[in-house]
Design a protein with these regions (language model features):
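Internal catalytic domains of large membrane-associated glycosyltransferases
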Residues: 2-3, 87-343
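N-terminal membrane-anchoring/stem segments of glycan-assembly enzymes
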Residues: 1-107
Length: 343
């Protein structure tokens, strides 16, 4: 469909002001539901109670005599690990609270949605096959006319770059939705700089961007539901899914996949319950409101030398915090299936 299109769409710049990490802007009021407070009480209060009780019993197990330094060191490490195990348990218990029913209604006049895949030398056969599968599914949904694929490449090696362009030509011939491709000559800021460059140059073209990793795969029904929830909730800045691991071939990889499939949904419900609208962002398999991201998530360059200074590497949770600081809801919805990532 898009084989004869130019490599990139017309420029639609969006200003992305660098944020201060030292001085917060005036924060609009945010509402935390009673359900979230209750989940936090169960998760953190329960872990505190269980961990304290376990540590007290460990101390009593030392006997009535004078404890030694080694015993106190043992107690400290026992408490640290036991509190962690206790929190894992109580956080899952919080997930048994009833899930909030989220609004979902597609806006017939809604803006465009970019499926953004940053790449850096990955196998183009794998990445483009995943994008083609998603494009073919999306073409059968109500959001087909709104969706475009945008590959933002930071690939530096010439052979890998040529491989990307060859695979791109095939993808554009076969894809039922538009496919755009941009490669930076220098990967300034790495992945966060790659995404920032996209937002600054074409952010004004899109209402939302679905962030994908090179090994991400998402079902069209899930993408449609995510867009519908964003359309229905104008204060929702970021919606994260719980990706399911796929593609493992070794025995260990298969075991990890099985474990994730077995108790991952329970963990996801617990995390979603106690985080509420103060959620996290894992950098992929999520949908983001572009203008909210642009106005809130311009990352500064930290003062000092690496690794303390320089560009922020673990940028995703910082971006989630900046969105929430600006008053946007950041949420993970564990009921959204059909989201996958390679192991």
């Amino acid at each position: 469909m898009s084989a004869n299109l130019p490599a990139v769409p017309p420029a639609a710049p969006l200003n992305m002001r660098v944020q201060s990490l030292r001085k917060a802007p005036g924060r609009p009021p945010v509402y935390t539901p009673l359900r979230t407070h209750l989940a936090r009480l169960i998760a953190f209060g329960g872990a505190l109670a269980i961990g304290t009780l376990g540590s007290w019993h460990m101390l009593k197990a030392f006997g009535d005599g004078r404890s030694t330094l080694l015993q106190y060191i043992l107690l400290v490490f026992f408490a640290l690990t036991f509190y962690w195990v206790a929190f894992s348990t109580t956080a899952c218990l919080a997930g048994f609270l009833p899930l909030r029913r989220h609004k979902a209604a597609l806006d017939p006049d809604g803006g465009k949605v970019a499926l953004v895949m940053p790449v850096y030398g990955e196998d183009p056969a794998m990445t483009h096959a995943a994008l083609l599968a998603m494009a073919q599914q999306i073409s059968q949904t109500a959001i087909a006319e709104r969706c475009e694929i945008f590959i933002i490449s930071d690939t530096q090696k010439p052979d890998a770059w040529l491989g990307e362009t060859r695979a791109l030509h095939i993808l554009r011939e076969r894809s039922p939705i538009p496919v755009w491709y941009r490669r930076r000559a220098q990967n300034v800021g790495r992945k966060s700089g790659n995404v920032e460059n996209f937002v600054r140059r074409w952010g004004g073209r899109y209402a939302y961007m679905v962030m994908l990793d090179a090994d991400s795969l998402m079902e069209a029904a899930t993408l449609t539901e995510m867009v519908a929830r964003m359309d229905a909730e104008p204060r929702l800045g970021l919606l994260q899914t719980m990706p399911r691991l796929i593609g493992g071939e070794s025995l260990l990889a298969r075991a990890i996949q099985f474990a994730g499939a077995l108790y991952g949904p329970i963990v996801a419900r617990g995390v979603a319950a106690w985080q509420g609208e103060d959620g996290n962002y894992w950098g992929h398999n999520a949908i983001i409101r572009v203008h909210a991201f642009a106005e809130s998530c311009g990352l500064p360059i930290l003062r000092g030398r690496n690794p303390i200074g320089g560009h922020i590497m673990s940028h995703d949770f910082v971006e989630a915090a900046l969105l929430r600081r600006a008053g946007w809801d950041v949420r993970m919805d564990p009921d959204l299936g059909g989201s996958y990532e390679g192991l």
